[in-house]
């Protein structure tokens, strides 16, 4: 009797683990900002970042060993992104290396990834460690955290404007927006 129960428990536990960790449903508030609009804005910002880095000779060239390394690591992860965001399979993924002592990496909406040399040089990351950092940053884009922040910011501004009109005919809208800004701070915990 104990063996079948143990086998059933192992089977159920294995099934749960095989599907990964449930991270919950994304906030529906993000739907207030069209994904395509945010992705186009991110593309423009990313292109500007690349131009600025290139002007400073800080954009890693395509044949740079670290650029090839980063792109190879990303190429192993990108085929699995649609599991978390079906639209991500249409994204035009880009991975670039920025020469800077900053210890940083990010992934913008639409799959625009940048890794700073500072994080690689200072921390001496292995490929697996780079994949962890990159995967974390990709998860922000897949979960559309920037889109959610933009929507919350719009709601805060709208609420401040409405309250400002009700309270003082619009005279206090600016102050109310400032007071509401902590509600929409990036990286806030919900």
Task: Label the predicted regions.
Residues 15-190:
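A Zn2+-metalloprotease active-site environment signal
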């Amino acid at each position: 009797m104990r063996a079948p129960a143990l086998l059933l428990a192992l089977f159920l536990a294995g099934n749960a683990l095989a599907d990964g960790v449930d991270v919950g449903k994304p906030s529906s508030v993000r739907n207030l900002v069209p994904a395509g609009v945010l992705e186009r804005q991110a593309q423009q910002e990313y292109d500007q970042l690349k131009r600025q880095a290139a002007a400073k000779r800080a954009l890693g060239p395509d044949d740079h060993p670290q650029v090839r390394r980063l792109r190879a690591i990303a190429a192993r992860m990108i085929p699995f992104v649609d599991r978390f965001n079906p639209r991500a399979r249409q994204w035009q993924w880009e991975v670039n290396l920025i020469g800077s002592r900053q210890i940083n990496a990010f992934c913008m909406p639409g799959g625009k990834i940048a890794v700073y040399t500072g994080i690689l040089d200072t921390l001496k990351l292995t490929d697996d460690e780079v994949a962890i950092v990159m995967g974390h940053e990709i998860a922000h884009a897949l979960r559309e955290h920037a889109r959610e922040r933009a929507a919350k910011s719009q709601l805060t501004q709208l609420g401040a404007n409405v309250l400002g009109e009700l309270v003082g005919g619009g005279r206090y809208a600016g102050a109310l927006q400032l007071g509401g800004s902590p509600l929409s701070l990036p990286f806030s915990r919900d």
